[in-house]
């Protein structure tokens, strides 16, 4: 392992888990494990400076020596097609739900699988560390509500674009059939339908632009004492007087203005790259039509 700033990077220099940098053709560079580990440390420290020092989130709690020291532990392994994960380690308080934990991060060892090619290697590493580091901050300071993982992923996907806006890895979640734009009738709080919660990272872009840069952090401060849906409602009302219900209705409007109908001044700044929301054609055979259907909570 190597100690770099606030982080201890654990990695192998031989074998299946050996990390590697990629060359211009996106192939692994032999004997580049140390360079990869140095990149992990530099990027992780940069992410911490942005998320903690610039955005004002709490830092990462001390893990009391787990992993070989007080530094936060990042493990580099061959994860196949998985970018990374953050694992709760030891409880900090004794709350039955919503408690805080120390944690560690595991990341892929080369990001060679990432698509498009422009995001392979270091770009994939960058957004992964921005994403997973915020999970560490969430778990360590604000609390882990086990039935509300959706908002943890929404926030961490949003954080990728905040810290590294040029990468746009989150675009991959917007177009597939499981996304918010293709299945808006799935509840906002759903975390069991494919990867739809990842496509809802755009909620963070909406909240930050509509209610201010500190609005998402205020939601997390409320999560210390309430589950995410209630916490979001409380935070938005304190900031703007708007309820979650009101904000959600406006968000649905934002999601109408994407693709060829985007307006980067009024809505998403990168909305021209987003798909348009799914539409359903209805044939009228008379002057009146009655449509009966149901919607899940917080869906459109």
Predicted regions and their residues:
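Glutamate identity and glutamate-enriched acidic tracts
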Residues: 18, 51, 71, 77-78, ...
